Amino acid sequence: MPLPLAVHAQDRLLSLNIHEEPAIDVGHLIPGMKLWPLFLDPDNGTWVLYAHYPPGTRLPQHFHTGAVHFFTMKGTWGYKEYPQDMQTPGSYLYEPPGTMHTFHIPEDGEPVEGFMVVSGVNVVFDDEGNYLSTDHAGSMEQIFLDAARRQGIGMPRYIRPSGPAAFTA
């Protein structure tokens, strides 16, 4: 049997190292939060990030339309709704579509770092259950571009699949 033809010819691997890319400070949204965009695919609704959160961070309650995979590298964090299930270094968390929760880090804890793969949309609510916003790969990309511009970083380096759908001829 012959080998399959490569669909995408590559001269190099598509690889990023967070130690070689500047963090994007999104403290204007969540104080002290820094993110590294790794892969943003607005067409398919997938966003892959490395995140740094300071102690005391609390994200608004949010509903996931798609699955989330989160691997904790440093620190301890949890969801307000599941105090018995704190995540620690080495923890892998799978969040199925349709889940809703409130991320928090203890005030007396250490900074948290982790790697996440998010599919779909996060629908964000305030403490009273009122709709605030939707976060998705496209909106996150705009947040990163705006924050990088404000910080004078220039164009952040991340992997983005080829552009929007178009006719071939």
Residues covered by each model-derived region:
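Residue-level recognition of well-ordered beta-strand positions that form the cores
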Residues: 50-52, 76, 117
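Ligand-binding loop in jelly-roll beta-barrel domains
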Residues: 84-87, 97-127
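A short secondary-structure junction signal
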Residues: 49-50, 82, 126-129
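Conserved short histidine dyad/triad with adjacent acidic residue
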Residues: 32-39, 45-63, 96-100
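Glycine- and acidic-residue-biased ligand/ion/polar-headgroup-sensing regions
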Residues: 54-55, 64-82
